[in-house]
Amino acid sequence: MMWKTLLCCLLAVSAAALDGWEPGKRYEYHVRGRTLTALHEVANQYSGFRFKGKLVIEPHTPSVLRGQLKDTYHMTVHRMLPDGWDQKFEERESNWERVGMKNKPFEVHVGNEFQFNKLIVTEDTPVWETNMIKGVLSQIQVNLKEVGPDPRDEQEDRLRKIFKVHESSVTGRCEVLYDITPITKFNMLPQPLVEIEEENVNVLQVMKTQNFTDCKKLPSYVHGFYNFHNVFPAQNKAGFMSRSQQTRTIVSRNKETGRFTIRSSVTFHEVVLKPELFNSQQGISVSRMNVTLEEIKSQQHIPPPRPPKDVGDLVYRYSAETGEPSQRDSAYALESNSDSSSSSSSSSSEENAANSRHRSSSSSSSSRSSEEMRDSKKHPRASTTESQPRNSRSRRSLQNSKRSINMYNDSSSSSSSSSSEEYLLPRPHIENAPNIPFMPYFVGNQGSKIGEVDPEKIVLLARTISSELQEPDTMVKKNILSRFSILTNLVRAASFSQLEEATKRLYYRVERADNGDESKLDAWKAYRDSVAQAGTPAALKMVHTWIRKEYIKDEEAAKVVAVIPHAADTPTDNYIAYFFEMVKDPVVHGEKYLNSSAVLAFSKLLRLAAVDSEAVRRYPVHVFGRMVPKNFSARVKEYIEYFANKLKNAVKDKDSHKIQVYTRALGNTGHADIIRHFEPYLVGRESVSTHERVTMVFCLDEFVKTQPSVAQYILLRLFENVGETQEIRVAALYLLMKTDVSAELFQRLAEYTKFDKNHQVVSAVQSAIRSAAKVEGPYKKETAKNAQAAVKILSSKPYDDSYSKSFILNNYRREIDVGYSRLYNQIGSRDSFMPKSVFYKLVNIIDGDRDDQAKFGGAVSSVRDVIDFIRQQFKKDDSQDELENSKYAEDDDIWDLREIANLLEMEEENVDPLEGNVHYDYFGAQRFFTLNKTSFEFREELKKYFKKPQITNINKLYNRMELKVGYPNVMGVPFFFTFKRPTLVKLTAKTFIMPLKPCDHGKPHKFPRIFNVTSDVSFVYSFDMHSHMGVVAPFNKKEYVTGIQRKHMIQIPLNVSVHVNLDKNKVAADFKPYYEDNFKVAEARGIPFTTVHDIKSLVPYVEAEHTSYIRVRPSKAYEGNFGKSVGMVYHYNFETDQQFFDYKWFSSNYFLHYPNVAFYYGWEAQPVFYYDFKLYLDSHNSPAKTVQLKASYDNRYTQPEEEEETRQHSKIRRPRSASRKHRRSRHEERAPLENLEVSDTETQREELYDIVLPAVRAGRLYYASVSVAFKGEENVYSKYEVEGALASSQVNEHISTMLRAHSNDAERKHQYAHVRVNVTMPQVPVIDYRKALEFDPTSKIQCEVHFGDTPEKKSKVYFQGKFERTDERKKFVAESDMAQLCSAQQNNKNYLLPACRNVTEEASKLDKYFFKVKYENLSEKCRNRTYKAYSYLRHYFFPYITENVYPDERKTDSVEVQVQFNEEINAVNVSVKAPILNVEFTDVRVYNKYARALFSLNPRYPLLSQVAKTAFPQYYEPTCVVDYSKVNTFDNRTYEHDMLNDWVEVMFHKPRSKIYKQVSVSAKQAHSKMVLKVLRGDEVKFEMKQPRDSSSSPELKMNDKVIEYERSPAFIHYKHELIAVAYALPSKALHLDLLNDSLVFVYDGERVMLHAGNHYRNQVRGLCGTFDGEPSTDFKAPQNCHVRDVEDLILAYTLVRDLDRSRLRDENICVREDVQLVNLTNHRHAEKSGIRPYDIDDDSSSSSSSSSSSSSSSSSSKSNSTSSSSSESNESALPRGENKLHRAQQPSRNCHMHLHRIVTHNGKQCISKLALTECAPLCREESHTTKTEAFVCFPPGPTADHYTKLVRKGVSPDFSRKTDIVNLRVTIPSRCVSKI
């Protein structure tokens, strides 16, 4: 019975096989094909070839066919095809050339589903011929298993079949959609594919559509698409590239026998792409193969192939030449159950879910209707993946990665599985170049590499590049960057021995920087950079050899190594292992810069190749299989362990540089294991600085990308720990925003803005959510929607821009699916106005994928320390190092600064050492530098230039981007696409600094104040964009290419001479062209082309003999000159095939971009056309040879009684000027450089001062001038000069300005303009808002403008303006809520609290303006320009504008303008009455807050101050107020105080740097009056007392000398230096400005308002708070602890001798600032996410404990205490160390922990109010003490459960407001030691 069954099966198989091929017959087919490439949307200019031949098939057995492909010819096509790629050709046999095929017989084995499972050819058949045979056979492989068994059945619904199968073809083994339909002869008439004469047949049309997204085998080569998460270039839809393949086969079926006959088959394979990724015009590569039955004959018995060679199924076969065959095992195979192509980390649940979704979505159903199938064919992009939300891109990309990997698992065919190893290439050896398929150089020689690389060719090409680099003018013409790309390709194909030989020929060592052969040096550098960019194993070994031989070292070697992660093409496990050994090499380890660069480069490569699941896009895993084996995760962890141990040793040695480097290295890996290595430091088990902890958080950035869900959990724990430092929390937030944040999580974050006390955190959350909500583009739509759900929840409180902020600004262009995004993050600083951490990133968005183009980031531990250290190096005079003895007069109530500090028991704060880091993209690589104090020693670095000229020689060639794709087309020949951005940066300079004024005697370390700088500079920047697509014809070593090359070059060769005089604030610079002859300044070329190129040629495509440029029309040439008027003539040439210049495109792509973005993306959406632009400096026709730039600045104070002396230059003194004993004569300060002496502008300056000074009488004077002159050898041919002076007065409330501009050009045209402006703005009340409302703040402006060619022909414009406050505005302010609040405060005698200050400011704002303009002799040109400006405004404000062209009264030679704001100053009406028309702008909204600040004038503030105050409302003018009964601190915390009966310290400043004077401000109240004393150092004392009567101003003394200031300002000097200015305000209050100390006092006898500069931040103590940006820290006592009550704060700062301050020593009253830390993970989450907990055996405590038992009911026993503590030990907050991580450094510090203890007392759950000391796990108690501690108790219920859970999670609750306190005695360990 079994034999019968087997026989039936064999007969069925035989019958199935014979259904298509009749035994004894010979089938002859005519084969025709073509493959063409073109920019078809630009022009129908094609390059490619045609193919024809004859295919003969004879059935040998029921399952074996024998065949032969013979009479094969090809013909080159390189011409215009007006009808497109399918244009018919005239058959001319003379153009056909024979294809060098063997034409040997082959054998095909047919499977049971009509599939060709095996192809056998002769051994001498080359691979390329085998692939072409496979391409032909793919046309006649048709699966007809679904066709009904009855051949006579002609019903259409039974013959029509739609189904899917996986089928092999030359393009891959992929899913194929079959659509079989009957077709009549009538339907075949319009397009007769084949003539069918038989009558007794049914004709079927078989349509096959190949789905490249679902493949078991997909022969393809991909490199460089790492950042393109939506791009799988070999699949159907790959972002900017799409690929499709369809086959139409005509099959006849005999009605009698049921036998099928393939009559005709034609396959179309199309690749459509945007050649430069973002073009609006696309290119195409199309292939068509047509097989048509010509005749059926009797069999002629084709012989079998001898000797036979099995070449597998029909899938394209690679040509393997070199490699390591032993490595081709299952460990490197890609299987469906693997995590990814390279990932070594565990699969997350998210990944598993993605896989299951993929499996369910990819299963096909044959029941789908034919209409649906047709619909899917019509809309191939509407796939399941594309229909998913865009915000799930990370999941989708991971799903697609899995899908690509699963292509290699063919479970349906045993033959396919068995040949999987043969399908992939052997892995490259470390000394050999990898065999890269599809790329021309590797397959162009009969399917193999074009011979062995001759080192002589490398040497010749490098020297050619070098020689052309010496002539930058010809760089673009000679295609240097194209040659560099060719050189890189040669190096990629070379073995190590060949590279070694080339090195011997090219290496050139320069003994002296100024004495070397530049040509030889540039040749070496070109070769060096090509090896760095090659990315092959041989290139890596070559780089290592160079380092060991010291051919490259230090920074040069660091730059080369930094490129490796991006350049590496095949980073196999052996490649990684070799790189790791190189990192550990002592030579590498000992090189400065190189050691850190190598570590960081290796760690990044480790992530890209072995951790990240996206490697399928970056590396050729479809060629070589996995880059690393499946079990490589263990090796990865070994590498990570190495870095972790290095980090541990660095922490032990307190080496900040190594700590940051190895932290960054661990972060680069992006592996889950780094969490357990960072955790001991982040949770405080090991002591590191705050900056180093912040660096660890930021270094989780790559982990966020590899495992976003796990990272989100960890970052959320860090952020939500309110006891953590603000820097850690903000850093965690910024990384958290890079994960997939849901709407719920956005809302959860938004809630923190309502209750979080830390302003830095709140500000960061606000800005991050608001920015995310405004992101545009379809790919961020979901993120924006989620963020928008949380915007309304945010707190409405505004925060200064100096706080932590996150901004995302993007621009998206829907028509081309391209955009860009700019991300800026900053972390605010406690001690400075400037942020302590910044990060900027410019991202290109192409089809939803993000590619980082520019990146910069930096962080420092203290901004103030950096600024002070730099200023210390360049400051003019030394400050006193030590405080001198007090110079004050005897006063029982006053102490010197040292005594005040001792009296207050002032403690020094622990300050972390200065450290930081900077990272940025640099020459195609990412660089990371650490900073410390020596990093800012600029003075010492600059002094090198004093000794001898310093030579700079930078010559760097690199690729900013390189993308490569290759796969076979239907003809079996390789298709390839490459996109490169080669870039050249060449900078040579010889610089020397010559001091002209020697350093002060005894101070040689000071930087000179007067010096010259000379430098010969040559800078060349060039970059190309090369986009090439084509096909390779292996049989004739040709490639048929279509491409675009854009070339750009900028050259700046200059001789620079600069004179700097810091004493006089003057600078002069001469810029002279380096070359005397004409030279090219800039060039830009765009060349679309087609070519037929010899692969062996080293000539760039655009220079090849058979290259044709694509020009859609005859080119037009333009040329011209400009610059004659200035004396420097520039000549330009422009050639293009465009009909006209599209200004609209230019403006939309350049002017509307931000400058930095336009630099990168000015080319987006640019049409593809030919252009050639050149710009020259025409030196021969330029009389001017030198450009001279001069600038000067001056500011000073002048006094009324010194006006006459001012003109004689006698007593006017500038603030911050040197004392007289250090001043030099004018002769000594003169610059000695010939023709470069700074012109004496004192005469001009005094002229302007004489003009502006009378209007103000006394006040501050400012002067600035800038001039540009174009000079010849002797004459000045043109000069342009602008100078101005400004005087502002506190006496008569005037501001006077004078501007003068003059120009004389080379054509003797003289232009001048004089502008004089006088502004009268009264001093408005500052203290009482009622007085401000009653005061008339009306201001006036008068302006006079003269301009023209000569004074006789001058035009005049007179301008008068008046600014008023309307009654409506006055009423609005008076009735506002803020005014009511202020009234209530004033009733309590508090006049200067924030509400009153704000309403007083609002009361003085002006809302109605009137201007009248008169003019004389205004030229028509000027009138026309004015009207054009109005036209732009009219267009912009179109909805709001009304014009009256027939006014009742016309103005003559005048214009009247009236501006009226509404009461809230958020809308404006403007009325203009002009001679030709009247215009009304109605209800124009003023949405922008800066525009409102600019236009809503306030007499108290200048315009720029108003804008700055809007950006920084709190810290532009930081203010502290001590009012009658309340204090408002610098950080805006308000608290009430009783009368200050004793002297109390208001502000005590003790700077960390010596460049600032120490300051003390103290106050005392008596009988409702306040006395104020200010100490400035130990030499100056100011005293302010209440006025003698109500009509007088307060009394002011300096060192007991009365200062008169009521009638005129007092200019106060000390030791010949102006130190202060005092004057009276309208309210009789005193305004005292300490100029050099940035302190301003407003004092009226009862209260004081103090404005302080931002350099005081976080360096003051007292009633005014800490000034660190956080109101919560304002109650900080001198002992650096925090009190809760105002009484304790005042006690802490009361200046009374022998005062009992013991209360402040109680830790419960004065609480130390401590950071409460939490564990990052718990056991459950660690197991779920694959993160190993930190191992105690690794010399650290465990991250979690297994004990979680609850405490017993005993109240105070030792056992109870111990039990309850152990139950919580694994998840509690831990103590801080040296930088607040640990209180003391004890030998057993790892055994001590601080935990909240939980006990049960009287049936209640009690939690210790403070964290108590406990012994850590694996430690034991050696001694203990018994103490009484405060516990907070809760009855059983939800509240108790809530706090218990918080404590167990590691959160330290705030019990400060709890009243249910119980004191319990507990046992606390005093010493813990390890059990091990």
From Swiss-Prot:
Residue numbers spanned by region Disordered: 322-424, 1192-1239, 1729-1788
Record's keyword terms, sorted: Disulfide bond, Glycoprotein, Secreted, Signal, Storage protein
Top-level lineage group: Eukaryota
Predominant place of localization: secreted
MF annotations from Gene Ontology: lipid transporter activity; nutrient reservoir activity
Localisation per UniProt entry: Secreted
Domain VWFD, chain residue ranges per copy: 1518-1703
Residues listed as glycosylation sites in the UniProt record: 211, 290, 409, 595, 631, 932, 1012, 1055, 1318, 1398, 1417, 1424, 1469, 1532, 1636, 1719, 1760, 1770
Role according to the record: Precursor of the egg-yolk proteins that are sources of nutrients during embryonic development.
Compositional bias per record (Basic residues), positions renumbered to this chain: 1209-1225
Species the sequence originates in: Periplaneta americana (American cockroach)
First and last residue of the signal peptide: 1-16
GO CC terms, sorted: extracellular region
Domain Vitellogenin: residue ranges: 21-838
Protein name in the entry: Vitellogenin-2
Presence of keyword Signal: yes
Cysteines joined through disulfide linkages: 1520-1664
Biased composition (Low complexity): 330-368, 387-404, 411-420, 1741-1772
InterPro entries to which the protein is assigned, alphabetical: Lipid_transp_b-sht_shell, Lipovitellin_superhlx_dom, Vitellinogen_b-sht_N, Vitellinogen_open_b-sht, Vitellogenin/Apolipophorin, Vitellogenin_N, VWF_type-D
